[in-house]
Curated annotation (Swiss-Prot):
Listed CDD domains: YihA_EngB
Protein name (Swiss-Prot/TrEMBL): GTP-binding protein 8
Required co-factors: Mg(2+)
GO molecular function: GTP binding; metal ion binding
Length: 285
């Protein structure tokens, strides 16, 4: 039934895509959504709905319902509409705004804000680049040199929202956090959602736990993104997803119960994440 609906919608969108030619503002660095819609059904499901794809491989007695928390399950039309929020055009300027080392240096903005946090090397820059792949002029700045000051980088996404790339936390995390990340998370008034990146190959580390505890302590609404899902076999990924899902279900209060598995290499899950961000920031009105 769901598959039929999916195919009905896909067929409809394909008609729309072919009627209008290439989608406006879509650049070649990411598979434009119209191209994704032309993929065979199995591949399309893997790219657009990675959790659904994983669910296919659940054996019936393996803790039913554990990854069935699909609270956010938009149609292909909705995902297609959200793409335009992330496509840079003259009327929808997507640009780097500024960097800050302290919250009082951060731009004062009214529009909703989302931030991305995660330990160094988790794949944060790669994900942000993937989100901005239809805004080729945006440079995602990376400052990885040891001793180089790490900053919060602010990006404006049209009139919709700002996206903040927070410094990655490493073994020197506590200092960075107290000075910057913690204050930002605690005091940023327009912060709508925090996206916490966890490496799906590694699982939740001690450093991730510090960030989770912080989000919990400040009662922030946050969302867990599982990165690099292209790196593991389906079996290993499923095991990791089930473990992390169980952790979220039993150990957290503020974490959105649905995980977002993504790959910045295959773009799997990236379109769905864009749609979620567009939705929670009210960009789809
Ligand atoms: P950051 O330190 O969190 O910003 O991490 P980066 O985005 O720089 O990524 C760290 C390393 O992981 C780089 O070598 C990336 O090429 C690699 N990487 C990032 N995302 C992915 C992914 O989705 N799949 C794979 N296979 N590698 C990734």
């Amino acid at each position: 039934m769901a598959a039929t609906r999916l195919w009905h919608r896909t067929g409809r969108l394909l008609e729309i895509a072919s009627a209008f030619g290439p989608w406006p503002g879509v650049y070649s660095t990411s598979p434009a959504f119209a191209e994704v819609l032309r993929m065979p059904q199995k591949q399309l499901r893997k790219v657009v709905y990675p959790l659904r794809e994983l669910e296919q491989h659940l054996v019936t007695d393996s803790r039913p319902g554990l990854i069935e928390q699909r609270l956010f399950d938009p149609s292909l039309e909705d995902i297609g509409r959200a793409e335009s929020v992330f496509a840079a055009t003259v009327r929808n300027r997507i640009e780097y705004l500024s960097s800050a080392v302290r919250l009082d240096h951060a731009p004062s903005l009214r529009q909703p804000e989302v931030c991305f946090i995660g330990r160094s090397n988790v794949g944060k820059s790669s994900l942000i680049k993937a989100l901005f792949s239809m805004a080729p002029d945006v440079e995602v700045r990376i400052s990885k040199k040891p001793g180089h000051t790490k900053k919060m980088n602010f990006f404006k996404v049209g009139k919709h929202f700002t996206l903040v790339d927070m410094p990655g936390y490493g073994y020197r995390a506590p200092e960075d956090f107290v000075d910057m990340v913690e204050t930002y998370l605690k005091e940023r008034n327009n912060l709508k959602r925090t996206f916490l990146l966890v490496d799906s190959v590694v699982g939740i580390t001690k450093l991730d736990n510090i960030a989770i505890e912080m989000c919990e302590e400040f009662a922030l609404p946050y969302v867990m993104i599982l990165t690099k899902i292209d790196k593991s076999s389906k079996g290993y990924l499923l095991k990791q997803v089930l473990q992390i899902q169980e952790f979220v279900n039993t150990q957290t209060q503020g974490c959105f119960p649905q995980l977002f598995p993504i790959s910045a290499v295959t773009y799997s899950g990236v379109h769905l994440l864009k749609c979620f961000i567009a939705d929670i920031t009210g960009s789809l009105k």
